[in-house]
Design a protein with these regions (language model features):
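N-terminal export/assembly leaders
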Residues: 31-57
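Charged, solvent-exposed interaction patches on well-folded alpha/beta domains
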Residues: 1-27, 48-56, 60-67, 71-252
Length: 252
């Protein structure tokens, strides 16, 4: 037993003295996200003042490096660990924006798939839905919140439309047809959401997200009829989905 403990202690000392041989970084770029690449991650680690390669494994603070990376606004998750042969590995998953918000002051930011606010990037612009119109909330004030926080705060819930925008963006993005047909969500002066189609110049008034699935089904029926009727698209200037069990259209 004593011999075993001595051997284990010797092995542990050897491991502590082992030098870090390499820094291996991988960045998940699924969904064509290019906010960050491996060179960016390496630079973040260098900017912390951390020396990695050539240093004893025991002196490399892996947990602090991981914590620092996870605090970055474009990173959804980062995992850092040291292999038994002295290679430090860092695996990064980027945040996935679902909508870009543009407010009245020209301030702009993303909301990601988890409902977290994230800034724009000088390096990459995500091809996502745009939400604009009568929105005044600046990113600086919102960044400490998430969509979940809005639902918990009565004041935020009463004044913010971002949770409505987030819910609609998720619905559109999850549907192959609508994600190919809708390019923008617009908030009008009545605080109703309007959706801007890729094709056609109609104003489509959606209202809020109440009965959202039903409203999209009504709109789909309208689209299907329009596709099968010559001149249908040119008849109407406004399509209003706010009313239950009906579509109210205004002719041009």
């Amino acid at each position: 037993m004593v011999g075993l403990l001595v051997t284990m202690g010797f092995v542990n000392k050897q491991q502590d003295a082992l030098l870090c041989t390499a820094l291996n970084v991988s960045v998940n770029q699924d969904n064509d996200l290019y906010f960050l690449d491996k060179l960016d991650i390496i630079q973040m680690i260098k900017d912390r003042g951390d020396s990695i390669v050539g240093q004893p494994k025991s002196t490399v603070n892996v947990s602090e490096i991981e914590k620092s990376l996870n605090s970055h606004s474009n990173i959804a998750n980062a995992e850092a660990y040291m292999s038994i042969d002295g290679e430090m590995k860092v695996e990064v998953t980027q945040r996935k924006p679902v909508v870009r918000v543009m407010n009245l002051d020209g301030d702009s930011y993303y909301i990601d798939s988890d409902g977290t606010f994230m800034p724009l990037s000088n390096k990459y612009t995500a091809k996502v839905l745009v939400a604009s119109g009568m929105l005044s909330e600046p990113f600086i004030k919102r960044y400490t919140y998430s969509i979940a926080d809005i639902g918990k705060d009565s004041l935020l819930n009463a004044t913010s439309l971002l949770d409505e925008i987030y819910a609609m963006a998720n619905y559109i993005n999850a549907d192959k047809f609508w994600s190919s047909q809708i390019q923008q969500i617009y908030i009008n002066k009545d605080r109703d959401m309007e959706i801007v189609p890729m094709v056609g110049d109609q104003k489509i008034i959606f209202g809020d997200t109440t009965a959202m699935d039903e409203k999209f089904k009504k709109l789909l029926t309208f689209y299907q009829q329009g596709l099968n009727t010559t001149g249908w698209w040119d008849k109407y200037s406004i399509i209003n989905l706010k009313f239950k069990n009906q579509i109210v259209c205004t002719k041009k």
